[in-house]
Amino acid sequence: MKKIILSFAFALTVTSTAHAQLPVTDAGSIAQNLANHLEQMVKFAQQIEQLKQQFEQQKMQFDALTGNRGLGDILRDPTLRSYLPHNWRDLYEAVMSGGYLAAAGETANLLRKSQVYDPCASISDKDQRIACEAKVVKPVQDKVMTSKAYDATDKRLQEIESLMQEINKTGDPKAIAELQGRIESENAMIQNEDTRLRLYQQMAEAQDKLLDERQHELDAKDNARRGYPQPKALEAAY
């Protein structure tokens, strides 16, 4: 009997130990862990969305300061790049040697419209006639050049005013920078053309002196041919 009791007690002990080793499933803990995991996933998604928005905002700011808005040529008039001809010195020399025949374009048109009497028509000597014609054409040519310079400068100033109005219409920093660059470019072109115009005026004054000197020489030549006494200054020169 004692052996039976001991055997039964041993069996109970083994059974209790076996039950103690089985895992216990806690449904509440699993649900809480899942909820925590989902909450973390939502936070991660929100952080990713915030980072995406920050990136887009930085990209917009970068694009606002960089890139090309295509405003470098807005309101630009290509005819104003050089309203004074590059060969104006050649034009002067052509008039000096060709007279009326060298007058072309606007100069010839203005000469025909403004001339009421030709003071050179009655001159029979060819050199004297061409010299006379050159003196007639020269101021007309100067007026055409000066008028072109004035009109072009006025148009450039109108362009600058329009560009300033465009600046007031936009809030794009890069567009404003491009428009300001255009304004600076137009101002530089006005200064460059002003320098060219000053050189042109100096050349015109020198050309007037050459025409006067040429006329004096032709008069002296004609006087010598006629046997008239020449001025002492000319006698010393020859």
From Swiss-Prot:
Keywords: Signal, Virulence. InterPro entries: T4SS_VirB5, T4SS_VirB5-domain. The keyword Signal applies. Residues 1-20 form the signal peptide. Coiled coil: none annotated. Gene3D superfamilies: Type IV secretion system, VirB5-domain. Residues 219-238 are annotated as: Disordered. The virB operon is essential for intracellular survival and is not involved in the invasion process. Constitutes a major determinant of virulence in mice. Transcription is turned on at the beginning of the stationary phase of vegetative growth. Belongs to the virb5 family. This is Type IV secretion system protein virB5. The gene is virB5.
